[in-house]
Amino acid sequence: MHPQNIALLTDSCADLSPRMIEENHIFVVPLRILCSDGEYLDGVNIHGADIYERLRAGELPQTSLPSTEDMEKALRQIIAEGYDGVIAIMLSSGLSGTYNLARLLAEECRDTIPIRVFDSLSGSLGQGLTVLQAAEDIRNGMDWEELTEHRIPKLIANTFPFFSVDTLEYLQKGGRIGKVTAVAGTLLQIKPIITFADDGQLQSVAKVRGRHQVMDKLVAMTKKCCGEHKRYNLAVANGGAPAEMEQVRQKLMQHCRITIISGMARSTEH
C-alpha cells in the first residue's frame, strides 16, 4: 500500500484546528454535544467558546459519541476519494464509546477497505499530536505495516497529557469525584493535576494549592517526561484560560529544548 493512499481518521476531541485538518488531509468525525436547547455537532455548529459560555451560565452540556451515520459518511468519503486503507485514532475508550463504534464499523467494511482502529488512550491534544505525527510519517513515506504495527502503538505509549481544572465542580457533577471531595477541594483551593491512566481513564497524579502552583507543576511534570530526549512534540491548550496557557508556554520554552510547540486554544479556535 502506497503511503500517500493511507487516510487518517479521528474525532473532534483531538482538538485540531481547521488549518491543521486541511493541511494534513485528516478526516474528522464530530462528537455530539447535548445542550438544553438541543443537540449540536462539535466543531460544526458549536465550538469550545460556546460550551464554556454555557458552563459559566450554569448549564452543563453533555457529550455523546458520534452518530453511526456520521462515522459511515466519513468512511464513504474516504473510499470515494480513492484511499487504499484507513488509520483511525480515536478518543480514549476510557471516556467514550467512540473507539468501539469505529471498531464495529471497521469490521463491517473489512471487505471494502482495510481499517486499523487505535485507542489513543488520551484526548484533546494528546490524541491530536498522535494524529499529526502519523500524518507526518505518512508524508515521509512510512508504510502501512510500520505505521500500524510499530509506529502508532509507540506514539500512543509515549504520549503524556497533563491538565488541571480551576474548579472541581464539573468533575463532581460528571461523577469523576465525590461531592465531599469537591467541596473540600474548593474550600482549600486544591487543584488536581490530571492525566490518563494506562486504561485511558482520568487519573489524578498530583494536587497543588492555587493557580500559580498549578502552572509550575505542569511545567515540572512536562520537563520530567521530556527528559534527555532530543526530539519531542509539545503542545499547550486551554479551556477558557488563554492567559494561563501563554504563561505555561513561555515557561516551557525557557526550560525545554523544544522542537515543536503548538499553542492551540480550543476556546478561541473555530
Question: What do these predicted regions represent?
Answer:
Residues 39-88, 92-110:
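Class I S-adenosyl-L-methionine
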